[in-house]
Amino acid sequence: MSDTTILISALETAPGVIIPLIREVPADRLKRRPSEGKWSAYEHAIHLSQSDVAFRARLDLILSGPEPLIKTIENSPEDEAGAMLEVDLDASLDRYVRERASLVERLKQLSPDEWQKEAVHEAFDHYSVFIMFRHLLNHEMFHAYRIEELLLKKDWD
């Protein structure tokens, strides 16, 4: 099995790990922030549901020409202030599943050369399609870890 096959498989199955984790968070904790400026499990989930669109756009950009510039994605001040708490969770998770399935199908069609295609990233020393989607997986697992921390947190005072 190649590295790309393993990566695609992990991306394909990630929603099956993350969504049940989100559903396990008790309703009274779901939107509760652990401290000022830190996201709730709900916000982490909404954020994850929005990520594939940006990474799909980056893929299209990288494949469109030689070494395009990839800008760092920053969270909006509105999101940091709690705007994601107003987004419908069920609709967002449905979107996450749909967009992930579409993204996975697109990734399965990439050639070995396309996986290695490089871009210039403003924050990283080197960047390729493979690195980008490995980064997406790591990003998801980071947020899943944060959700699990909030799920299991004992001391909420």
Language-model-detected regions and their locations in the chain:
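Solvent-exposed interaction patches of small proteins and small membrane subunits
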Residues: 2, 6-9, 33, 68, ...
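Short coil/turn segments at secondary-structure junctions
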Residues: 1-2, 43, 80-90, 127
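Acidic/histidine-rich alpha-helical segments that form the ligand environment
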Residues: 10-15, 79-116, 132, 136
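Glycine-rich, flexible loop/turn motifs
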Residues: 26, 35, 69, 80, ...
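Short, contiguous alpha-helical
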Residues: 31-75, 104, 118-157
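Alpha-helical bundle segments that constitute or directly flank the non-heme di-iron/ferroxidase center
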Residues: 1-29, 50-61, 134-138
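A short secondary-structure junction motif
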Residues: 21, 25-28, 66, 110-113, ...
